[in-house]
């Protein structure tokens, strides 16, 4: 099973330790930061999939930190922890689309672990979608190039039963086209 990197940002060391303990049995490498600035520094160096941030931190609030994460690292899934006193800030962050989930302190370990697992899956699915979209874009470009070089090649003909009619193309011509496409995909 692949190990996923998650980042915990809280100015209270006891909270960081408790969160880290929560994920001991999960396939995560937990990075920690005691400030938003330190968290941003870690994000610059490590591919993080999920950030869990406290809302009430000195220097930069969790909402402001997660807003910066959204802009600089849009693929990272963001979760906020908050005390009841800072619930308004959490709601504003949710409404601005900066966080995936939020939890109040004290949190339920099971629910938090489930949310992080879902967040990692969300990250992985979105990354796979981006990868597949890149492939589709390359294939569309190749189709345009083929259509330019071989007019009509991308148009299909159907028989009366709806089956595609395949024209006879010499094997040498097919081999040449495949070789050209292989060169473009390997580039």
Locate each region found by the language model.
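Two-component/phosphorelay signaling modules centered on CheY-like receiver
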Residues: 4, 13-32
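Active-site residues of response regulator receiver
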Residues: 10, 54, 82
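The feature encodes the CheY-like receiver
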Residues: 16, 58-59, 82
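Helix N-cap/capping motif at the beta->alpha junctions
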Residues: 32-41, 62
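Short amphipathic alpha-helix used as the core "switch/output" element in two-component signaling
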Residues: 41, 63-75
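Active-site beta3 strand of CheY-like receiver
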Residues: 46-52
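C-terminal output helix
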Residues: 107-116, 120, 124
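C-terminal output/effector regions of signal-responsive regulators
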Residues: 131-187
């Amino acid at each position: 099973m692949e190990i996923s990197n998650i980042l915990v940002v809280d100015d209270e060391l006891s909270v960081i330790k408790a969160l880290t303990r929560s994920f001991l049995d999960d396939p995560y490498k937990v990075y920690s930061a005691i400030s938003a600035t330190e968290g941003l520094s870690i994000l610059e160096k490590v591919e993080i999939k999920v950030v869990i941030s406290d809302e009430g931190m000195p220097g930069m609030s969790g909402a402001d930190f997660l807003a910066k994460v959204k802009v600089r690292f849009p693929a990272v899934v963001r979760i906020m922890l908050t005390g009841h006193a800072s619930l308004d800030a959490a709601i504003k962050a949710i409404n601005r689309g900066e966080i995936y989930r939020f939890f109040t302190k004290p949190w339920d370990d099971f629910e938090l672990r489930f949310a992080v697992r879902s967040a990692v899956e969300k990250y992985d699915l979105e990354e796979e979608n981006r990868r597949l979209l890149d492939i589709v874009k390359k294939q569309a470009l190749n189709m345009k190039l083929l259509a330019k070089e071989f007019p009509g090649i991308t148009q299909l003909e159907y028989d009366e039963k709806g089956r595609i009619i395949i024209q006879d193309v010499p094997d040498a011509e097919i081999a040449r086209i495949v070789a050209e496409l292989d060169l473009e995909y390997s580039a």
